[in-house]
Amino acid sequence: MAQEEVQKSADVAAAPVVKEKPITDKEVTIPTPVAEKEEVAAPVSDEKAVPEKEVTPEKEAPAAEAEKSVSVKEEETVVVAEKVVVLTAEEVQKKALEEFKELVREALNKREFTAPVTPVKEEKTEEKKTEEETKEEEKTEEKKEETTTEVKVEEEKPAVPAAEEEKSSEAAPVETKSEEKPEEKAEVTTEKASSAEEDGTKTVEAIEESIVSVSPPESAVAPVVVETVAVAEAEPVEPEEVSIWGVPLLQDERSDVILTKFLRARDFKVKEALTMLKNTVQWRKENKIDELVESGEEVSEFEKMVFAHGVDKEGHVVIYSSYGEFQNKELFSDKEKLNKFLSWRIQLQEKCVRAIDFSNPEAKSSFVFVSDFRNAPGLGKRALWQFIRRAVKQFEDNYPEFAAKELFINVPWWYIPYYKTFGSIITSPRTRSKMVLAGPSKSADTIFKYIAPEQVPVKYGGLSKDTPLTEETITEAIVKPAANYTIELPASEACTLSWELRVLGADVSYGAQFEPTTEGSYAVIVSKTRKIGSTDEPVITDSFKVGEPGKIVITIDNQTSKKKKVLYRFKTQ
């Protein structure tokens, strides 16, 4: 039994030995895993390195945790600081203005506001042509040299077969030798060329002659390119001087006001404002705006259509435009007359802009535009409306932020839905926010909301005209439907009492009389009661010489179903 157990144990012990043999054979056949085992085993054999690795993390752990805690605290403080620091709108605008000024300064130094001149382009094209010709000639020379070397190699191939076999065997194992192949080939070709010269000198002489015949154009063309480069480097680049509306850019506080307008037009996006400024400068140069202003040409036939008159309640100059004048065929019958009107309109705009005192921070640097749509041409005249859209777009792009408010009065019923549909296409959102539309019945109230009646021309419902009462204040009153309204003008002593009165909408009755304050005196009729129609003179001007204390009583009878607005002023002298 003991012998059997010994034999079994021996068999068991022998079993793993038998299994190890095929494994070792496999390991020997595959070289890569054996190398990995040897590389891994190298650090494991050093027993001294193990305790060092185990000790160092334990010592460095608290320091790392401390650094992490410090970094977290710093991040928390930064976050708190970011939450606390909030830039106001003025600070954001100042920062954007400084960035914009830097970009404008760089553009002036690089002369980016001037368009490239055509002669310079021609010179560049000539230089390019010469360079291309030289490149083509070099290519032809290289091709000829390649053909000559190929011929030499074909003739001498049987002489050196062993060298090529050695090259192919040496280039396979190492990648770096593949890069050195062209050098080796060059050496071989030179050796072959020397042998070829000994064998056949005639072919070499022919090749040299062909090469020499091509070389002279290189020496002739090369100095031309060098001369052009030297001329380009010799030209000094000076900063460009650009001015808009008579104000040079980046000179004083006036330019800050102008640059701020371009920033506001592009919502303080600096790069977009710079492109807008460049486009405006280019547009002014192409259309010769400065020369147009200096010419001083005035066309009286357009003055009835567009004119500047008075100021609004905030001090902005008001510019009135009458779209009904576009129906005049004598003025707007063809494109030439339309373009003539556009140039005159630009000239008027330039004069109004140049009259602004940009150095005064309290001065208003924008305008109020009042556009009268009474008797305006219908949508059937597409060419005319396309011209109007183009003109509006030009003013919006090249005169940014010069409109404080735009009032459209006497707007017909068809224009309101048209504007709601196509308004987003015609104008920008910023411009639409400044627009106010009013129909015929609400036009006067809309104007008087922004402009005082004494500043509004008589044509548009005001009392602004050259009279002795111009400096007097105007009083407004409302006459209710189917009611009378009386106005009393006192006279404390003997004097001459003058007054001006206007009823918006007409269709009322007007009368005036003098009533003395002393007993026993009789009333005196100054103006008999009469009806005022829409065709009558809109402004009633009257006066009375008072001989004793009393008052002038004016009676207005409104028998219509609509309320009426009355404007009047008076003066004693």
Curated annotation (Swiss-Prot):
Expressed ubiquitously with higher levels in expanding roots and leaves (at protein level). Gene3D superfamilies: CRAL-TRIO lipid binding domain, GOLD domain, N-terminal domain of phosphatidylinositol transfer protein sec14p. Residues 1-74, 111-202 are annotated as: Disordered. Residues 89-157 form a coiled coil. Pfam families: CRAL_TRIO, CRAL_TRIO_N, GOLD_PATL1_C. Residues 295-468 form the CRAL-TRIO domain. GO terms for molecular function: lipid binding; protease binding; salicylic acid binding. Residues 18-28, 35-74, 120-169, 176-190 have a biased composition (Basic and acidic residues). It comes from the Eukaryota. The keyword ATP-binding does not apply. The modification N-acetylalanine is found at A2. The modification Phosphothreonine is found at T29, T118. CDD domains: SEC14 (cd00170). PROSITE patterns: CRAL_TRIO, GOLD. 'Patella' means 'small plate' in Latin. Keywords: Acetylation, Cell cycle, Cell division, Coiled coil, Cytoplasm, Isopeptide bond, Lipid-binding, Membrane, Phosphoprotein, Transport, Ubl conjugation. Carrier protein that may be involved in membrane-trafficking events associated with cell plate formation during cytokinesis. Binds to some hydrophobic molecules and promotes their transfer between the different cellular sites. Binds to phosphoinositides with a preference for PtdIns(5)P, PtdIns(4,5)P2 and PtdIns(3)P. One of its GO terms (cellular component) is mitochondrion. It is found in: Membrane; Cytoplasm. This is Patellin-1. GO terms for biological process: cell division; pollen tube growth. It comes from Arabidopsis thaliana. Belongs to the patellin family. The modification Phosphoserine is found at S195. Residues 471-572 form the GOLD domain.
